[in-house]
């Protein structure tokens, strides 16, 4: 469980080990610090138990995390009511009202009779990222395509706007989802 001292004050930073099941001592320390929110960049297996135990201890502040929370099992582990007032960032949401996203969702649903998830959207985007690089390279030569990929700047895709930085890391949009009564609900999109 982390905080970002350059954004907000950070009253405490705690850690846990994967596969832990009892978080009471850690949560007791966190509760004593009276935080504004708790950030857990973990996976649903532990996060579900942490949130359940936190709510049982009376910790009602928002919890925030990332795509490691994105599993139906999180709801089973935490309980739908305990997930209220929790938020995650993810790559995409089928509820995003953006017109291009809704066209993608409709086309995917028409073909596969289900809504696309984040992995479907990322797969779709990876094809268009490569297509864009090939077109800008004017070639399918691997070195030219690699160089074009590295120069990607402000490419608008289904999962958001993507640029590649000097270390070859993607700088991209993040979709904020909120849990309401056990369901992920689109909250907002943060662009770089």
Predicted regions and their residues:
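Extracytosolic ligand-binding ectodomains
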Residues: 1-192
